[in-house]
Amino acid sequence: MIQMQTTLGVADNSGARQVQCIKVLGGSRRRYAGIGDIIKVSVKDAIPRGRVKKGEVYNAVVVRTRRGVRRPDGSVIRFDGNAAVLLNNQLQPIGTRVFGPVTRELRSEKFMRIISLAPEVL
């Protein structure tokens, strides 16, 4: 459950370490984003010589949340932290690798690239 001002870790090798949600996309009054939702983020911490710089604004897809996601069989998958993968304007991943597990809920037409790059799909 991600809202404005939430800080997230970055689960790819784009060069960003920490990002902050500045907008939840998808409707003017939408408050929260979950796994698989697209948010607008600002880079708060970046590594030197990375693809992205501190202060830049990107789209991102949420891949892990502490709140987790509920499956139809009643099980809940939760994670230790919130994480996102940075996207460009065409909603393609900026990084070439994805770190850590992602959930099966990302298996839509838009995010198959992230699923294929991830080391583990839960």
Swiss-Prot record:
Q: Which PROSITE patterns match?
A: RIBOSOMAL_L14 (PS00049)
Alphabetical GO biological process terms: translation
GO molecular function terms attached to this record: large ribosomal subunit rRNA binding; structural constituent of ribosome
InterPro entries (UniProt xref):
Ribosomal_uL14, Ribosomal_uL14_bac-type, Ribosomal_uL14_CS, Ribosomal_uL14_sf
User: Which key words are in the record?
Assistant: Ribonucleoprotein, Ribosomal protein, RNA-binding, rRNA-binding
User: Can you cite an annotated GO cellular component?
Assistant: cytosolic large ribosomal subunit
Entry's SUPFAM superfamilies? Ribosomal protein L14 (SSF50193)
The answer to whether the entry has keyword Ribosomal protein is yes
What does the UniProt record say this protein does?
Binds to 23S rRNA. Forms part of two intersubunit bridges in the 70S ribosome.
Similarity remark: Belongs to the universal ribosomal protein uL14 family.
Subunit arrangement?
Answer: Part of the 50S ribosomal subunit. Forms a cluster with proteins L3 and L19. In the 70S ribosome, L14 and L19 interact and together make contacts with the 16S rRNA in bridges B5 and B8.
Q: What is this protein called?
A: Large ribosomal subunit protein uL14
Taxonomic lineage from the root: Bacteria, Pseudomonadati, Pseudomonadota, Gammaproteobacteria, Chromatiales
Designated gene of the protein: rplN
